Amino acid sequence: VFCNTKKLAEEVALVLRNLGFNSLALHGDMEQKDRNKILVKFANKSLSILVATDVAARGLDIDSLDLVVNYHLSRDPEVHTHRIGRTGRAGNTGLACSLFHESEEYKIEILEKTLSQPIKRTLIDSVEKDFTPAQPDMTTLQIEGGKKQKIRPGDILGALTREDGIEAREVGKINISETSTFVAIKRHSLKKALEVLNNGKIKGKNFRARKI
């Protein structure tokens, strides 16, 4: 979900969380380490909805998104094109939609000229209130060790799938930074994965692991 201001990004993310959605905001006022954690969670599918400003989303490197929503229309047609280009990549299917008021019709007309194609308008009469938000299948663990400690993805997978551990299919994307490692784990295997990591060793050493 794209917003034009940091304040609105925070507010929209909060409203979505209050409705039961797994949602976080991403904007330039956040510390880099916090932005990195959120981007990792979104990329490894342990975060369902990312509400971001354009500047903050520049580091988003995902092959394709199922849905892109413009909560605000971008002031720049090129930025709009870049936003919606994040869905339906490489032959995948995806949906991009924009929320706008009738007073912004002229902006839609500008976008149609820029994109050289018509944009379908749909009037929203009401919003379905009787729903249960889906939760992501994955969750993310952070291990306090990374490249500096010469940790590799195979070391993490081996530690998690040892005899008393979890199955390899329960482990998702593994991201290793200089001093931390982020691992996507199936939500139902979270407790066991934490137990295995915190009571075991990686490369012969103890490393603390926690859910983020």
Feature annotation, model-predicted:
Residues 1-212:
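Conserved helicase RecA-like core
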